From Swiss-Prot:
Identification of the protein by name: Small ribosomal subunit protein bS20
Residue ranges, annotated region (Disordered): 1-26
Gene3D superfamilies per the UniProt record, alphabetical: Ribosomal protein S20 (1.20.58.110)
GO biological process annotation, one example: translation
Similarity section: Belongs to the bacterial ribosomal protein bS20 family.
Stretches with biased composition (Basic and acidic residues): 1-18
Primary gene name: rpsT
GO cellular component: cytosol; small ribosomal subunit
Upper lineage: Bacteria, Thermotogati, Thermotogota, Thermotogae, Petrotogales
Length: 100
């Protein structure tokens, strides 16, 4: 137990931040699972693209609020995007080196 008022306030603030950060992290997990579910259900292209856009917004919001690290956010977005592209069969062909 904190002995000073300021220490009590810091405990309250840290608990509030923890709850908020966990909420952001929970939303990221939920949207990721929803994308996986839609892929397994053979969802339409439009539906998946809207869901992907929504997931990017959620991840960026969590990043901007400091709930997740910027590298984690970038990695998560990249993995989700690759997963959706692979499902849709839109993988870009590997570029061949230019012969000079």
């Amino acid at each position: 137990m904190p002995n000073k008022k300021s220490a009590e306030k810091r405990v309250r603030q840290s608990e509030q931040r923890r709850q908020k950060n966990r909420g952001y992290q929970k939303r990221i997990k939920e949207i990721s699972k929803e994308i996986d579910k839609k892929i397994h259900e053979n969802a339409e292209r439009e539906e998946l693209m809207q869901l992907l856009s929504k997931s990017f917004k959620i991840i960026d919001t969590a990043k901007s609020h400091g709930a997740v690290h910027k590298n984690y956010a970038a990695r998560k977005k990249s993995k989700l995007h690759l997963k959706v592209k692979k499902y849709l069969g839109e993988m870009a062909p590997e570029s061949s080196p230019v012969n000079e």
